[in-house]
C-alpha cells in the first residue's frame, strides 16, 4: 500500500481526486482496493518540548537557570485534539509499503511531514510530491513526477534549524528580560522573538525619526520658456554649488536668493538658448508575476488590504483551484510551463471585460524574463490555473486579487515598454536651467496598467519636449518661486512593514552588511510575515491608527533596555543567510545552533545586570520604596511588592489599583497579609491577601470572625 500524507484535509481530497477518487473513511481516503490511501495532518501535529517538559524546575522563571539549552531536542503532540489523527497516521504508516510526502512545497511544509515520520521511526521509502496548483491536470502531472524525498533533506534541516533558533531566542530571552522588567513593576511577561522583536523595532525607530523630524523650507525657481512662439518648455534653476543660501543638502533655503534670480531673468534683456541635449532610449522589461509578499504590498497600496487578508484570500483562491500555491517567495516561472500559456490565457477570456481585450491581444511568441529555471526552487510565482473562473462567485477582495494575478501573468505576453527620455540644459544670463521630458515609443506591457499608473505626473517634468537642437534660442514666458518643504518619513502600514521585512538589507545597522544581505529573502517567510505583524498588534506592541502602525508604550519600554543584538535586524538577517546555507548543504543544523549559543548567553548575562526604569504610573510600596505589581492569587487579584522576599507587604486590589490605606484587618495567622471580604460558593468569607497564606475566616455581619486575641 502507498500512503500519501497531506498537510491539510483539503489538499488530501484533491490528491485523492487526482488518483481517481475513493472512499472517504473519515480520517483518510481509500483509493480503489486500498492500493493507495490518502491521509492528512492539520498543520503541525507535533511541537517542540516546552522548558518545563525538560525539567520541572523551569516552571518557575529564575535568571540563575538560564540559558536553557536542550542537550537533545524533543517533540510532543501539539494537544489532545490531534491525538486521534496522529494515531490514524501511525497505524497507516505501519501498514504502508511506501509513503508519499505531500506537505506544502516550502520550508515548513517539508518539516511538517518529515518530523512526523521521524517521530514514528519510519523506515519505509518516502517520495515527495510538489503541488503548486490544485486543478485536476496539475495534480495529475505532479503525481506522475514524484521525487525522492531525500532530495529535500536540506530544506527540512533549514526549517528545523529555524525552529530551534526561534525556541532558543523566545524561551531564553523572554524569560531573561521579563525578570528585571517584572522587578521594575511591569506586570506582563515580555515576549521576545527572533523576528518579532526586530520587526517591532522597525516601527519604533521609524516613529522616533518622525518625532525628531524638523521640516526644512526650501525654494526652487521654475521658468517656462517659449520655443517658436508656441511650444512651452518648463524648467528648474540649477544653482551653482558655491552660491550663498544653500544648506548641506544643496537645497536653496534663502527665498531672497530665489526671488533675486527670478528678477534677474525677468529683467535681463539677453537671449536664452539650449546649451546641451541628452536623449536616451530606455526599455522596461515586462513586470514579473507575483510572489506572495509582492502581491501583499501592491494590494495594500491599491486596496488598503492588510497582508493577512491577502494571504487568506489567496489561500481560498488556491483551494478553489483558480490560482497556484499562495505562499511563494518566487516571482519566476519554470520554462516547461510556457507551453501551458495558451490554455491558461484561453481560460481568462470571458472572465472580466478588462481581461478580455488583454487576453485576446496577448502575443504567445513573446518569451519574457519570467521564464527562468535557474530562479526556481520548490515553487514558482503565483499565476492563474487553467480552471475557468466564475468571478461572480468570488467576494470583492478575491475578485480584485484574482484580476491582479491574471493581469501580471498576461503582461508576460506583451512587448517591452520603450520610451525616450530627454534632458535639456538652458543657459540665460550665465545661469543654468534644466528641463526633462519623456516620450513613449512603445507602450507595451504598461498599457495593461495605464488606468492605475501615475508615473507620468512627475513634478516639473514635461510629458514631451519639442524637437529642438543645441544652440537654438528660447524666450522667457513666465516664472515663479516654488516654496517646498521636506517631508517626514512615512509611518509603516502593515503592507509597507511587510515590504521592509522582505527588504531587510535596507534597514540594517551595519551598512557593510547591506550588499551581502541583498540576496537574503528578508526576515520571516512568505507564510509567517503577515502573522507576525498581526501578533504584534494582538500583543499590544503595535496598534493601528487609521491605516498606519504606531508603537505602544510597551514597545518603547522594551526598546529602552533590550540589546541591539535583539532589536536590530542584522543578527536575524544573518541567521536567515545561514539557513540558506543549511538548505544548500553547506552547513549542518548543529553547526548553526552551536554558533548561536554565545549570543544567547551574552543576552542572558546582560539581563542579569539590567536595571529597568519603572513604568510612568508605577505605585511605590509604602514600606520599602520598591514598586508594587498586580498579581493573581487564590482569592483573586492583589498587589505585591517587587522587593519580595525581603519585603512581603501585600495590598488588596481596588478597581485595578492597590488599596494602600491601612483600613483592613491584618491576618492573625501570618501577620503580613490583610484580610479581604470575598464571595465564594457558599456566601461571603474573609481570605488573606498573602499568596503564601491559605487561612480563611467566616463572615459575621460583614466582618471577619477572628480569634479573641487577634490584632486589628
Residue ranges and their predicted role:
Residues 1-171, 488:
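Intrinsically disordered, low-complexity regulatory segments
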Residues 51, 95-100, 140, 234-239, ...:
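OB-fold/S1-family RNA-binding modules
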Residues 138-223, 280:
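C-terminal or mid-to-C-terminal helical accessory/interaction module adjacent to the motor/catalytic core
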Amino acid at each position: 500500500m502507498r500512503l500519501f500524507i497531506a498537510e491539510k484535509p483539503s489538499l488530501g481530497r484533491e490528491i485523492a481526486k487526482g488518483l481517481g477518487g475513493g472512499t472517504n473513511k473519515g480520517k483518510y481516503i481509500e483509493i480503489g482496493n486500498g492500493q493507495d490511501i490518502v491521509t492528512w495532518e492539520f498543520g503541525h501535529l507535533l511541537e517542540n518540548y516546552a522548558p518545563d517538559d525538560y525539567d520541572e524546575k523551569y516552571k518557575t522563571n529564575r535568571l540563575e537557570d538560564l540559558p536553557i539549552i536542550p542537550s537533545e531536542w524533543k517533540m510532543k503532540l501539539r494537544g489532545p485534539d490531534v491525538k486521534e489523527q496522529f494515531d490514524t497516521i501511525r497505524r497507516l504508516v505501519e501498514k504502508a509499503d511506501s509513503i508519499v510526502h505531500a506537505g506544502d512545497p516550502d520550508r515548513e511544509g517539508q518539516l511538517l511531514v518529515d518530523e512526523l515520520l521521524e517521530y514514528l521511526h519510519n523506515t519505509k521509502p518516502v517520495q515527495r510530491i510538489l503541488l503548486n496548483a490544485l486543478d485536476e491536470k496539475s495534480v495529475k502531472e505532479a503525481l506522475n513526477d514524484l521525487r525522492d524525498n531525500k532530495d529535500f533533506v536540506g530544506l527540512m534541516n533549514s526549517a528545523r534549524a529555524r525552529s530551534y533558533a526561534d525556541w532558543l531566542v523566545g524561551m531564553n530571552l523572554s524569560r531573561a528580560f521579563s525578570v528585571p522588567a517584572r522587578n521594575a513593576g511591569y506586570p506582563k511577561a515580555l515576549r521576545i522573538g527572533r523576528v518579532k522583536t526586530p520587526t517591532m523595532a522597525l516601527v519604533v525607530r521609524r516613529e522616533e525619526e518622525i518625532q525628531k523630524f524638523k521640516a526644512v523650507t526650501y525654494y526652487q525657481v521654475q521658468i517656462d520658456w517659449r520655443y517658436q512662439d508656441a511650444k512651452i518648455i518648463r524648467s528648474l534653476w540649477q544653482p551653482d554649488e558655491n552660491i550663498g543660501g544653500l544648506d548641506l543638502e544643496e537645497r536653496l533655503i534663502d527665498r531672497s536668493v530665489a526671488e533675486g534670480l527670478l528678477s534677474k531673468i525677468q529683467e535681463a534683456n539677453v537671449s536664452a538658448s539650449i546649451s546641451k541635449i541628452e536623449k536616451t532610449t530606455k526599455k522596461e522589461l515586462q513586470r514579473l508575476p507575483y510572489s506572495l509578499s509582492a502581491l501583499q504590498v501592491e494590494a495594500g497600496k491599491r486596496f488598503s488590504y492588510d497582508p493577512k487578508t491577502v494571504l487568506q484570500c489567496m489561500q481560498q483562491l488556491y483551494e478553489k483551484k483558480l490560482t497556484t500555491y499562495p505562499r511563494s517567495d518566487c516571482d519566476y516561472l519554470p520554462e516547461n510551463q510556457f507551453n501551458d500559456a495558451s490554455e491558461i490565457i484561453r481560460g481568462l477570456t470571458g472572465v472580466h471585460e478588462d481581461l478580455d481585450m488583454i487576453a485576446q491581444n496577448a502575443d504567445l511568441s513573446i518569451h519574457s524574463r519570467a521564464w527562468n529555471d535557474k530562479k526556481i526552487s520548490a515553487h514558482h510565482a503565483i499565476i492563474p490555473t487553467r480552471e475557468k473562473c466564475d468571478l461572480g462567485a468570488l467576494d470583492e477582495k478575491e475578485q480584485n486579487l484574482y484580476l491582479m494575478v491574471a493581469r501580471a501573468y498576461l503582461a508576460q505576453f506583451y512587448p517591452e515598454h520603450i520610451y525616450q527620455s530627454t534632458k535639456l540644459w538652458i543657459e540665460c544670463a550665465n545661469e543654468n536651467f534644466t528641463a526633462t521630458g519623456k516620450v513613449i515609443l512603445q507602450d507595451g506591457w504598461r498599457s495593461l496598467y495605464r488606468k492605475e499608473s501615475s508615473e507620468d505626473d512627475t513634478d516639473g517634468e514635461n510629458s514631451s519636449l519639442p524637437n529642438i537642437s543645441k544652440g537654438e534660442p528660447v524666450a522667457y514666458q513666465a516664472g515663479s518661486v516654488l516654496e517646498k518643504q521636506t517631508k517626514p518619513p512615512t509611518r509603516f502600514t502593515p503592507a509597507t512593514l511587510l515590504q521592509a521585512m522582505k527588504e531587510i538589507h535596507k534597514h540594517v545597522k551595519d551598512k557593510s552588511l547591506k550588499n551581502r544581505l541583498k540576496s537574503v529573502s528578508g526576515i520571516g517567510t512568505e507564510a509567517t510575515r503577515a502573522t507576525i505583524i498581526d501578533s504584534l498588534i494582538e500583543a499590544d506592541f503595535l496598534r493601528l491608527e487609521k491605516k498606519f502602525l504606531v508603537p505602544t508604550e510597551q514597545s518603547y519600554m522594551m526598546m529602552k533596555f533590550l540589546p541591539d543584538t535583539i532589536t536590530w535586524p542584522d543578527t536575524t538577517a544573518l541567521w536567515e543567510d545561514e539557513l540558506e546555507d543549511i538548505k544548500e548543504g553547506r552547513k549542518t543544523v548543529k553547526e548553526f545552533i552551536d554558533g548561536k549559543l554565545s549570543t544567547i548567553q551574552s543576552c542572558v548575562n546582560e539581563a542579569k545586570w539590567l536595571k529597568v526604569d519603572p513604568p510612568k504610573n508605577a505605585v511605590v510600596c509604602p514600606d520599602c520604596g520598591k514598586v508594587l505589581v498586580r498579581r493573581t492569587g487564590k482569592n483573586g487579584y492583589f498587589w505585591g511588592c517587587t522587593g519580595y522576599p525581603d519585603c512581603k507587604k501585600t495590598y488588596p486590589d481596588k478597581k485595578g489599583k492597590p488599596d494602600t490605606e491601612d483600613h483592613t484587618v491584618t491576618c492573625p495567622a501570618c501577620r503580613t497579609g490583610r484580610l479581604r471580604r470575598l464571595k465564594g460558593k457558599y456566601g461571603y468569607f474573609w481570605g488573606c491577601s498573602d499568596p503564601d497564606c491559605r487561612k480563611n475566616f467566616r463572615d459575621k455581619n460583614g466582618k471577619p470572625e477572628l480569634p479573641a486575641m487577634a490584632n486589628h
